[in-house]
Amino acid sequence: MEIFNDLSRKLVFPIDYPSQRRVAKLTDIILGSGTLVSCLLGFYAGSLSLTLYAFAAAYGLALLLVVPAYGKYRQQKLAWVGSAAATTKDL
């Protein structure tokens, strides 16, 4: 189990902005609920193609909601550390 935790920490790239974290959560919610709804819909209808079309619609919805809002990813600016030259200049 420890190997999987180490591997997941190495494969996940850090999220820089808090807005990116919110968008990643929104994407996970849309795709997760879309997967659940499409599986249930396809199961009750007995159609694999309906399952795939419903998931494609959820994927398209996620793309429409997340991709065009690139400016919203940078609403909350990060506080960068000052340069080392500015701190050692006073010595």
From Swiss-Prot:
Disulfide bonds: none annotated. It is found in: Endoplasmic reticulum membrane. Its main location: endoplasmic reticulum. Residues 1-28, 72-91 are cytoplasmic. GO terms for cellular component: signal peptidase complex. It comes from the Eukaryota. InterPro entries: Spc1/SPCS1 (IPR009542). The chain crosses the membrane at residues 29-48, 52-71. It is a multi-pass membrane protein. One of its GO terms (biological process) is protein targeting to ER. Pfam families: SPC12 (PF06645). Residues 49-51 are lumenal. Keywords: Endoplasmic reticulum, Membrane, Transmembrane, Transmembrane helix. Component of the signal peptidase complex (SPC) composed of a catalytic subunit SEC11 and three accessory subunits SPC1, SPC2 and SPC3. The complex induces a local thinning of the ER membrane which is used to measure the length of the signal peptide (SP) h-region of protein substrates. This ensures the selectivity of the complex towards h-regions shorter than 18-20 amino acids. SPC associates with the translocon complex. PANTHER family: MICROSOMAL SIGNAL PEPTIDASE 12 KDA SUBUNIT (PTHR13202), SIGNAL PEPTIDASE COMPLEX SUBUNIT 1 (PTHR13202:SF0). Component of the signal peptidase complex (SPC) which catalyzes the cleavage of N-terminal signal sequences from nascent proteins as they are translocated into the lumen of the endoplasmic reticulum. Dispensable for SPC enzymatic activity. Belongs to the SPCS1 family. This is Signal peptidase complex subunit 1.
